[in-house]
């Protein structure tokens, strides 16, 4: 079952259907706050 990630009202379900970690990484790289996912962007840098 695909996990729908909604950020700022945008559905990212079909953009990156791989892993949550990858979604968080991509989200941080474009400046999206991923604090709601339980991950922190600072851990990637």
Curated annotation (Swiss-Prot):
In which family does this protein belong, per the annotation? Belongs to the coronaviruses ns4/ns4.8 protein family.
What effect on the protein does mutating residue 29 to F have, as reported in its record?
Answer: In strain: Isolate BCQ.1523
Biological source species: Bovine coronavirus (strain Quebec) (BCoV)
Instruction: Report the domain of life of the source organism.
Output: Viruses
Q: What is this protein called?
A: Non-structural protein of 4.8 kDa
Among the Pfam families in the record, one is Corona_NS4
């Amino acid at each position: 079952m695909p996990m729908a990630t909604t950020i700022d009202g945008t559905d990212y379900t079909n953009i990156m259907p791989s892993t949550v970690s990858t979604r968080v990484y991509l989200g941080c790289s474009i400046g999206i706050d991923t604090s709601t996912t339980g991950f922190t962007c600072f851990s990637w840098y």
